[in-house]
Amino acid sequence: MSILPGFALVVLLLAASSAAADGFVLKKDVVLGSPAAAGVAGPMFVMANQIESTAPNVIVATGNVEARQAGQNFFADWLRYDTTLNFVDARGQVRLEQPTLWVSGDTLKFNLNDYSGELTQPTYQLIPQQGRGIAPPLQQGSGNALPMQQGRGNAERIDFIDANNSTLADATYTTCPVGNDDWFLQVGELDLDKTRQIGTAHNATVRFLGVPILYTPWLDFPLNNNRKSGVLAPTFGTTQRSGADIVVPYYLNLAPNYDATLYPRLLSKRGLLLGGEFRYLLSEAGGVNRLDYLANDRQLDRSRWEAVLNNTYRLSPTTQVGMLYNRVSDDDYFRDFSNQAAITSISNLNQEIWIRSQHSNWNAELRAQIFQTLQDSTSPTPITPPYARLPQAHLGMTQTFGPGIEFKLEADATYFSNPSMVEGARVLAYPTLRLPLTNSFGFITPQIGWSSTYYALDSSAPERRISRNLPIFSLDSGVTFDRPFSLGGTDYEQTLEPRAYYVYAPYRDQSAIPVFDTAQLDFGYAQMWTENQFIGGDRINDANQLTLAVTSRFTEAATGLERLQITLGQRYYFDSQQVTLPGVAPRTSNTTDVLVAFSGQITHDWLIGGSGQFDTQNGSTISQKLGASYRPGPGRVLNLSYNFITQNTNQIDLSAQWPLAQRWYGMFRYNYSYFDNKLVEGLAGLEYNGGCWLLRGAVQRLATKDAQSTDSFFFQLELNGMGSIGSNPLHVLKQSVPGYLPSNEIFPTPNENLPTP
């Protein structure tokens, strides 16, 4: 054996025995940086049990061959290297390691000039440059993608086209760990583009537990976390109103800062609904715009549609313009096409354009706003449409001067339009002065303001010109006492925080003033500390009242964790009420109900909370809400709540997520109204975590606002790195079961042992 002169490489010729004796080893390229440019690969370093030259500029290495050159490592039982052609021929337990691809097989032929070659019977593993897997483009951060893992597979042959492209024939692809082929993609040809980080499969079949479940003649997918254009996983579902529901979205990655999604939706009872969404984010603008259109609803023999336009544009660092447009074709659109309670109960859709300017001590807004009111066809009482604001101008200002005196101004001018009611303009201004005085143990804040309002009404009003002017005075004060104590070996701090809030506003007759945008607030803890019991500008209460409350907090001294907070409060009236809304009787009592509220994390696993409103004069309960949540660990949550309001609500709400067996989780919700004698929402679901795949199913019954209910079924199979198939129940589960976590977020590593109950 010899080292040939004139080699453009360095050969380390070491017998196995001498290598062991002298301690020499070949330091392989662990980092595997980017390959050198074609034709300038640089020297090759070789180590083997035996190395010999068999021809000019040709060496043959035998036994435990290790070689390194230009950011890639070779391993084989036998390797031949031609320095003239810069060509490698390797056989027997061949392994090639590149920055984004590790591959092993039987025989390798590889040209180091252009990185072309061929490997037979390969087994490969992809090493993504960003992250460790694939996330659906529009679902990042939503919990819809399974844990990201490296892709792997095998093939009959792999052809290396160049440094960044290769093709595998008769290949498989999966993200399951080695030894687990629960699911894999079987393809006739698989192209890997490492520059674009995209894999393209031809004649692809998805096999799950040995059963083919999906075939496509063409499929591409990202090899990292980057977004890319392509068909997203289809979703399947069913509802009573629309029947089978199939959606096949197509995602368009138009640019890093804007994209679009097209989603044809086939509804077996109604027809084909075409939908599209466009999103963009620029330095000076941004928005989300969506349109759904069903040309002919077979149930109603007419078109159905929904439009949502939400856009903003920044004119300057302090000024923005924007528009929001929500509209549907008919009153029943959401009941027919949605299975979310928050959507099916929508009554008014907002449509507005605006311009806003925000500065350090003042802000201004000009807008025009109208609503689409959705009537309930099954209800005998029609919904009164809210007033349109055509237009509304608002000005806010704050300024501090002198010895901490705070000046604040809220001014508003609006024309209210509603053809079925009194219309007109309202101008109001409310300047205030307040002086906050605080120290380490308490505070006192006096405030005085002057409210001025002017109305110019149309000819249908009894009085066309109305003015209202009145002063408003308030005094807010509170102190804090604290003491340390120990319980069960743990140091705590308890506070006692009494607070008093006095308000005075003289009576002004407001019976001739129409109600444009005003409602009476329900009495609660937050409303105890407000000057006005009405929200909106059309009523200002006459007030001569004092609110007293006390709060006590129990806090761990070492951690600052608040274990328990309890509040007790009541308001006292010194004059009878005179200002009311039309049809509402004035109060007859000189005190309000007593309010009680509590919350806290009483142990590591238990959270509690509740509130109550009690009529002390009649000894009755007006309302109460009690809740508890037991959360001993991720994926283990039990929620219980009870909600009662006199002559209105009497509901119990139970929900849970819990491991049933190893890899199995169960979820449910039972929300029942005893007042209406009906199920508000019922949900039952199961979830199985297979490590590199996840199967979940759920069934939901949801009461709609028309006193009926709708049933929905969800069934979804998630394949790690390939997306999901079926109807996605995650939004429903997270909304219905507070604290719910998908099991792949609880145990993000597929090899990790999953718990038993």
Indicate residue ranges for each PLM-predicted region.
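N-terminal signal peptide c-region/cleavage motif recognized by signal peptidases
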Residues: 15-17
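Interaction modules related to DNA damage response and DNA replication/repair
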Residues: 30-41, 45-47, 62-78, 91-105, ...
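Cleaved targeting-peptide boundary
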Residues: 21-29
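Hydrophobic helical h-region of N-terminal Sec-dependent signal peptides
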Residues: 8-13
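Outer-membrane beta-barrel proteins and related beta-barrel translocases across Gram-negative bacteria
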Residues: 101, 107-173, 178-189, 193-757
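Bacterial N-terminal signal peptides that target proteins for export
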Residues: 1-7
